[in-house]
Design a protein with these regions (language model features):
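DNA replication initiation modules
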Residues: 10-11, 19-22, 38, 103-132, ...
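Acidic surface patches and DE-rich sequence motifs
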Residues: 72, 175, 255
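Catalytic micro-motifs at enzyme active sites that drive phosphoryl/nucleotidyl and oxygen chemistry
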Residues: 106-111, 150, 156-176, 205-209
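DNA replication initiation on ssDNA origins
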Residues: 1-118, 128, 139, 150-151, ...
Length: 272
């Protein structure tokens, strides 16, 4: 699968749906470039990716069985863990937070604030939380119209929460280790961390503070792992919507992508 290399500006001219990713196997984790979202879709259909995801899940299942048998401390478990880590490094990856990084270099000092996606990815890492969290996310999103589902939604969520989060679930996929990634639109005025925290509380999922760094990546899984995709996932917002977000951040003394204006201090402690 090949694609002519496009600049971020060229991508913007061709489509409103753009993704920053590295589509290669065993890719350099510091390199990332802008692509049309259609290229991502084609990538998920590649047999090698499905095979790689399958290998990771098979090894993960073996690990889970060992955990049930209380064999987590053994050498075999650690060997499986190393194999899984190596295989995960072979996966292509995407940026949930930016359409573009300066010089195609994935690091905080190369972030392009103008290319903020106004979305983030919630990582559901606890296996026992995956199914309920996905169900709650779709319910909160307004996906179910049956009377019983509506009543249940109104019972477990407040009217304000339903109004705020309706339509903000953009994408749900199974992760390589058979957990879940839920991509959400960040509500106006919220930062990445605030949006993740608020959403996790509502869907009863454990919040992962390590998942809020601006330059974080998400490993890409195959087409069969995709559960739900909204039409505006990785879609560049119109000028009016962008202006509303930026004004809300400005009133809080934040940069146009919700980061502190003095980002140098934040960079030093953030993971790469």
């Amino acid at each position: 699968m090949t694609q002519k290399s496009l600049t971020f500006d060229e991508c913007k001219q061709l489509s409103s749906r753009i993704i920053a990713m590295n589509p290669n196997r065993r890719a350099n984790m510091g390199q990332i470039s802008s692509h049309l979202l259609d290229y991502y879709t084609e990538l998920t259909k590649q047999p090698w990716l499905a095979q790689l995801v399958g290998q990771i899940r098979d090894l993960t299942a073996q690990q889970n069985q060992m955990m049930q048998e209380e064999m987590k401390a053994g050498e075999t478990y650690q060997q499986l863990d190393r194999k899984i880590t190596d295989l995960k490094k072979q996966l292509p990856f995407r940026s949930p937070h930016y359409f573009h990084f300066l010089e195609d270099h994935r690091a905080q000092k190369f972030i392009d604030p103008e290319a903020f996606t106004f979305q983030t990815t919630v990582d559901i890492d606890n296996p026992e939380e995956v199914e309920p969290a996905v169900k709650n996310a779709l319910l909160l999103n307004g996906m179910f119209d049956e009377p019983t589902e509506k009543l249940f939604r109104e019972k477990i969520f407040s009217a304000e929460d339903i109004e705020l989060w309706k339509g903000k679930v953009l994408h749900i996929e199974r992760s390589a280790r058979n957990k879940a990634h839920i991509d959400i639109r960040i509500p106006v005025g919220m930062t990445i961390a605030e949006a993740q925290s608020a959403f996790c509380k509502l869907i009863h999922a454990t919040e992962d503070p390590s998942c809020v760094t601006p330059e974080r990546i998400i490993f890409i899984t195959d087409a069969a792992s995709q559960i739900y995709t909204a039409d505006d996932w990785y879609k560049r917002l119109d000028k009016e919507a962008v202006a509303e977000y930026r004004e809300a951040y400005r009133k809080r003394g934040l940069d146009i992508d919700g980061r502190p204006l003095d980002v140098d201090s934040a960079r030093s402690g953030a993971s790469q």
